């Protein structure tokens, strides 16, 4: 929280996109420490700043609505609202620029983990399949970590045909070191 607050304090003249980013970081940090009111206040600040930024026009390659929805998802998750986190992550995926393949793989895998957490195995498998579509085209340790996690989460469900099909497909795509 202190780092996020320090970054925001060091940028008093930042533009609305940067303010949205910083408020999103502060919201996530506050949520991680259990400060619900502060987290929600910072999310509102981030949304307001993003509205101002979007009214000025699109800025490819900077903090955008997909990033804001990612932060909203993280805050909701940290505050125990898994369904709300899933909705925000789905919205993030919907508005993310197609060139952000690495983030798409990681965030879709995270979305699948959350879908599984609330018992939606079929939806999780569909989302993991989408993540695997892009996975061979990225090089990312964090994406690898998500694929490794996927294998572990799927193992208890391998009697389910959908889960087994996903597991088998992933084994043909992922490096053997991630399957162990």
What are these regions, as identified by a protein language model?
Residues 1-180:
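Conserved binding/catalytic microenvironments
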């Amino acid at each position: 929280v202190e780092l996020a607050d320090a970054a925001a304090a060091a940028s008093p003249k930042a533009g609305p996109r940067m303010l949205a980013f910083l408020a999103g970081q502060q919201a996530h940090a506050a949520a991680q420490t259990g400060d619900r009111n502060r987290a929600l206040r910072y999310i509102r600040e981030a949304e307001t700043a993003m509205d101002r930024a979007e009214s000025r026009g699109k800025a490819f390659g900077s903090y955008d609505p997909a990033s804001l929805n990612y932060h909203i998802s993280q805050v909701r998750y940290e505050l125990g609202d898994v369904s709300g986190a899933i909705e925000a992550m789905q919205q993030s995926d919907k508005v993310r620029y197609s060139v952000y393949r690495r983030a798409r793989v990681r965030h879709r895998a995270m979305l699948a983990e959350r879908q599984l957490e609330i018992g939606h195995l079929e939806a999780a498998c569909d989302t993991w399949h989408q993540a695997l579509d892009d996975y061979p085209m990225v090089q990312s340790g964090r994406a690898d970590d998500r694929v490794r996690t996927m294998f572990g989460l799927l193992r208890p469900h391998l009697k389910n045909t959908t889960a087994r099909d996903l597991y088998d497909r992933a084994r043909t795509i992922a490096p053997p070191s991630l399957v162990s």
